[in-house]
């Protein structure tokens, strides 16, 4: 019991150290230098640094390889850059998302040289910004073999539950046209914003699918997230644009999802209107049949649920590597002014 308490105390301390190192996206060098220095003390690891990404691998001693991955960056500060520490919790930006998970990865890499399967630890940059900047893509472009594994587990905050797969995400813009006129003579024009009434009703009434896949219930969603339009207080607007977010369950692909949304919205469109996909990231299958993941769930009696958001498990799924989310911290606290991680969760 004494050794267990010491180990937990060290993990908590390491998490606090990591939280104290600012690492907003594109500014991760300091925290990556810290991690690299720690890893250099483990002679059983082969370490590769590519930009602000680090991959540490054990040798090939078994027939299976497990990859543990985590991003080192955080979102910009929003009132949570003042770090607080109590006996039970650490408050601060990145504490839940995901420096508790990074601390666990780093501790395992440094303290467990003899593992049941071969290990790959991936500390990567720029997850919290547009996907094109993601450090995993930088690693793949330079040395893709470093990301080969039989299973990938990302240490995103899941409150210690397995969150299987992930839902895909798509963003659309819908631009509707009108005709400009003076508001004193609206019959001489056509109000583009008024044309939104039918579109908004259709989206509000949209019945989302809730498929159960490998025992996990996913919940698709369709939401308007932005409305743009208007010229001046006395002008009938001749254009308006909606931004729409669609979450896609992993039992179908993005092409099928796009066709459905186009079928939903095209009845409200006319010549000159435009519906565009401006961003898309695919879903990932649950992967619960993977023997390493199955053994882990059964041995530790872990709860399993669907991942409703999008994470980089989709990157690995696209590479043919089953992947899941599993880490300390409450995801609902991520990116908030009250972001924190509890000792018990770590």
Enumerate the predicted regions with their spans.
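Metal-dependent amide/peptide-bond hydrolase catalytic core
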Residues: 3-6, 23, 157, 164-165, ...
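Acidic-glycine-rich active-site phosphate/pyrophosphate-binding loop
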Residues: 73-86, 149, 164-175
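Short glycine/serine- and small hydrophobic-enriched flexible loop segments
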Residues: 17, 107-114, 198-205
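Acidic/His- and Gly-rich active-site-bordering loop/insert found
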Residues: 2-95, 330
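Acidic/histidine-rich catalytic neighborhood of metal-dependent amide-processing enzymes
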Residues: 103-171
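Hydrophobic/aromatic beta-strand patches that form the interior of the parallel beta-sheet core
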Residues: 66-68, 122, 153, 324
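Glycine/serine-rich anion-binding loops at beta->alpha junctions
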Residues: 89-104, 182
């Amino acid at each position: 019991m004494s050794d267990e308490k010491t180990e937990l105390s060290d993990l908590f301390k390491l998490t606090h150290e990591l939280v104290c190192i600012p690492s907003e996206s594109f500014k991760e060098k300091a925290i990556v230098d810290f991690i690299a220095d720690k890893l250099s003390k483990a002679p059983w690891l082969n370490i590769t640094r590519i930009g602000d990404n680090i991959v540490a691998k054990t040798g090939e001693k078994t027939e299976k390889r497990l990859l543990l991955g985590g991003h080192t960056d955080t979102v910009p500060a929003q009132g949570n850059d003042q770090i607080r520490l109590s006996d039970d919790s650490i408050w601060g930006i990145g504490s839940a998302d995901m420096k508790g998970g990074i601390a666990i990865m780093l501790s395992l890499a440094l303290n467990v040289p003899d593992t049941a399967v071969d290990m790959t630890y991936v500390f990567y940059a720029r997850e919290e910004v547009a996907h094109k900047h993601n450090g995993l893509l930088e690693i793949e472009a330079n040395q893709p073999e470093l990301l080969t594994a039989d299973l990938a587990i990302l240490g995103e905050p899941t409150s210690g539950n397995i969150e299987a797969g992930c839902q895909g995400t798509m963003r659309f813009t819908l631009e509707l046209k009108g005709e400009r006129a003076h508001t004193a003579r609206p019959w001489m024009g056509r109000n583009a914003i008024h044309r939104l009434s039918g579109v908004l009703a259709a989206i509000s009434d949209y019945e989302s699918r809730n498929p159960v896949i490998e025992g996990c219930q996913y919940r698709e969603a369709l939401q308007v997230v932005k409305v743009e339009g208007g010229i001046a207080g006395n002008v009938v607007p001749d254009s308006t644009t909606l931004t729409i977010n669609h979450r896609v369950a992993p039992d179908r692909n993005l092409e099928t999802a796009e066709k459905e949304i186009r079928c939903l919205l095209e009845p409200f469109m006319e010549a000159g209107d435009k519906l565009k996909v401006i961003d898309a990231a695919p879903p990932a299958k649950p992967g619960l049949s993977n023997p390493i993941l199955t053994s882990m769930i059964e041995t530790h009696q872990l709860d399993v649920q669907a991942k409703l958001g999008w994470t980089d498990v989709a990157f690995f799924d696209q590479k043919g590597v089953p992947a899941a989310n599993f880490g300390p911290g409450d995801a609902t606290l991520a990116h908030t002014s009250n972001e924190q991680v509890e000792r018990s969760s770590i």
